[in-house]
């Protein structure tokens, strides 16, 4: 099995040896397959953001290792720099980090730092703007003239323009309306499919993660406490409740229907799955009541 990213006994301690010492992540063994769409969930302060900042070398472990394609990302300064182009990280509310005079220049910032030619930079800006759902006419505007959703897309385009093998997003749809959230998720999927990219998404939106990811990792107090498919994770309603997390609403409705005697499987976690199961059950229930 090909793992593009892997951690080995990864630990990070903030302010070690002081009264403020805090173990953010502890002894994490974690791996992501090439092309996988991974969701990371957990309560606030569980270690999610600390983990993802290690995955592109932004933070250095207190102990342990992070590997990209089998090589320790801190094996040399040059490789650590390369990793930051290969593993793109979009922070929460990335629109607050826009700073250039035009949207074009903001998106071009990463490719320029990669020392690409002017023509290649232009090609990448236009391509990434397309993936992010930005019209060409917006590229010459100041980023501060854009709407909130457009700023978010411009910030994501700036990371996509580096064509990362791994795209990591921290709450990419936070604060957006439903249409804006759907658009961002579609944009991310378009990039993933076009470049066979690996996507890692941190989110509190359980409906979103249930619909889109291949696998979920659940963090609690700096440790991984659950790792599996969305169906596996969201069928453990009692465990999620104990961890202070809400399951997708469809999972909760399905559980109530099962309690009333309806034979729904435990892995119903999306509206589409619920519709399919209810259609299958309708003839049986009709025959039973005839």
Where are the regions a protein language model picked out?
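Catalytic Walker B motif of ABC-type/P-loop ATPase nucleotide-binding domains
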Residues: 167-170
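Conserved ABC ATPase "signature" region
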Residues: 119-137
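Helix-to-loop junction immediately C-terminal to a conserved catalytic motif
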Residues: 56
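Conserved catalytic motifs of ABC-family nucleotide-binding domains
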Residues: 163
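ABC ATPase NBD Q-loop/coupling interface
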Residues: 65-82
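Conserved ABC ATPase signature
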Residues: 142-146, 150
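Conserved ABC ATPase "signature" C-loop
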Residues: 221-222
């Amino acid at each position: 099995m090909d793992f593009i990213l892997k951690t080995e006994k990864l630990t990070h301690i903030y302010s070690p040896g002081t009264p403020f010492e805090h173990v953010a992540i502890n002894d994490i063994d974690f791996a992501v397959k090439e092309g996988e769409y991974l969701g990371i969930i957990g309560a606030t302060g569980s270690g999610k953001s600390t983990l993802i900042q290690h995955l592109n070398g932004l933070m250095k472990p207190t102990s342990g290792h992070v590997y990209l394609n089998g090589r320790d990302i801190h094996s040399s300064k040059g490789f650590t720099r390369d990793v930051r182009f290969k593993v793109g990280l979009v922070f929460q509310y990335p629109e607050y980090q826009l700073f250039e005079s035009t949207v074009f220049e903001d998106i071009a910032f990463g490719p320029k730092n990669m020392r690409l030619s002017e023509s290649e930079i232009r090609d990448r800006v236009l391509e990434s703007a397309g993936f992010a759902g930005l019209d060409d006419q917006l590229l010459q505007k100041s980023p501060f003239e854009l709407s909130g959703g457009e700023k978010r897309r411009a910030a994501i385009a700036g990371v996509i323009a580096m064509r990362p093998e791994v795209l990591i997003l921290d709450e990419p749809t936070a604060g957006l309306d439903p249409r804006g959230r759907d658009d961002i998720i579609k944009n991310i999927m378009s990039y993933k499919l076009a470049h066979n990219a690996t996507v890692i998404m941190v989110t509190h939106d359980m409906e979103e993660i249930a619909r889109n990811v291949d696998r979920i990792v659940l963090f609690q107090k700096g440790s991984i406490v659950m790792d599996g498919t969305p169906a596996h994770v969201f069928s453990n309603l009692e465990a999620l409740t104990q961890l202070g997390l809400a399951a997708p609403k469809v999972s909760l409705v399905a559980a109530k229907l099962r309690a009333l005697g309806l034979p729904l499987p435990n892995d119903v976690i999306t509206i589409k799955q619920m519709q399919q199961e209810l259609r299958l059950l309708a003839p049986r229930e009709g025959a039973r009541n005839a």
